[in-house]
From Swiss-Prot:
It is an enzyme of class 3 (hydrolase). PANTHER family: COMPONENT OF ATP-DEPENDENT DSDNA EXONUCLEASE. Its EC number is 3.1.11.-. This is Exonuclease subunit 1. It comes from Enterobacteria phage T4. The lineage of its organism: Viruses, Duplodnaviria, Heunggongvirae, Uroviricota, Caudoviricetes. It comes from the Viruses. The gene is 47. One of its GO terms (molecular function) is DNA binding. Consists of two subunits: gp46 and gp47.
Length: 339
């Protein structure tokens, strides 16, 4: 049996942005086409199907229904675990959008509790977001499980949320009994020991620029996984001056950031030609105008990320979850600005 595995979808992201929705539709179509060619009728989605925790719009609800119907028409059953973005409250499993909006469909199976599922003789644990309410239940399930494989929405230490941005979280030792652990939650692909973060099926922000995205096929008979890259990297970063010959059509309908390290007479034309085809264009100057200093006085230097975190931690009268979200957002902006 072959299973298609897909990371976080984040339906409704950026206030139901139509361009992002087009990216998601394109990715779903690619996955369906691959499934049809390879006889796949089972998908596992790794949580965060939805993006906005507390205000899912009618447009997002409609979009989710259309996707589920498209999957049903293709003969595909979707297994999905509940991620933190699917929850109304971060530390309580209910209410959650996946259960409320998707569980009613016959071809969708929502997992809001740790569950061992038999996929043609291959036992896989499907484990939702671990929070204050269900930590004991999840740890006990893992301790007594006979499954060799685990799908989760884990927040583990030492992996990467975005390329270049290391995560903080639980040490992954409690998962060592599994042969392989696959996880959503972090958006870039990374792995260590028996844990692999599979990444999102498509790029969503500038923090994803030039970062491979796609989906994964797992064969329960051979226990082999294969990465199938998305045909399009929707967020691209290029450097100017551009080395070699550029075909501007390659950037049609993409979000492009140009890092300028030198200004010459052709820069204006370069920007103009890109503007004709791209979805959005950002030009960032990285020209080094620094001047060497003879000042030998020692100065204590802290990283910008450390300073941002200290500033956010000093903000009064905000909840711990809001503080954590602000730090994560600030780190994301830092990655976008420095890559």
């Amino acid at each position: 049996m072959k299973i298609l595995n897909l990371g976080d979808w984040h339906l409704g992201v950026k206030a139901d942005d139509e361009w992002i929705r087009g990216i998601q539709i394109d990715g779903i179509k690619q996955a369906i086409e691959y499934s049809k060619k390879n006889g796949i009728t089972t998908w596992i989605q790794y949580g965060d199907i939805f993006d906005v925790r507390k205000a899912i719009t009618h447009k997002t609800m409609e979009f989710a229904r259309e996707i589920v119907q498209t999957l049903d028409d293709a003969g595909i059953t979707l297994h999905t675990i509940v991620g933190n973005h699917d929850l109304h409250y971060k530390n309580v499993m209910h209410p959650n959008a996946s259960t409320e909006l998707l569980a009613k469909y016959p071809n969708v199976k929502v997992y809001d509790k740790p569950t061992t599922v038999d996929f043609d003789g291959c036992l896989i644990d499907l484990i939702p977001w671990m929070c204050e309410e269900n930590t004991g239940e999840i740890l006990e399930h893992i301790k007594t499980s006979s499954a060799s494989f685990c799908v989760g929405h884990w927040e583990l230490n030492g992996f990467y949320f975005y390329k270049g941005m290391k995560s903080h979280g639980l040490e992954p030792d409690f998962l060592k009994t599994y042969k392989e652990v696959w996880s959503g939650h972090f958006h870039t692909i990374s792995e260590a020991a028996n844990v692999r973060y599979i990444g999102t099926p498509w790029t969503l922000t500038a923090g994803d620029e030039n970062d491979p995205r796609g989906f994964w096929m797992f064969d329960t008979e051979t226990e082999r996984t294969e990465f199938i890259p998305n045909n399009t990297t929707w967020h691209r970063r290029i450097h100017y001056p551009f080395k070699g010959k550029i075909d501007y059509k390659d950037f049609t309908n993409l979000s492009v950031r140009v890092i300028v390290t030198e200004v010459d007479k052709n820069l204006t034309k370069f920007e103009s030609e890109l503007e004709k085809v791209v979805h959005s264009l950002r030009v960032v100057s990285k020209i080094d105008n620094s001047v060497e200093s003879d000042d030998s006085e020692e100065v204590e230097v802290q990283s910008l990320q450390t300073l941002m975190e200290e500033y956010i931690n000093a903000i009064p009268d905000i909840t711990d979850s809001d503080r954590e979200a602000l730090i994560q957002y600030a780190n994301q902006l830092y990655v976008e600005a420095t890559q």
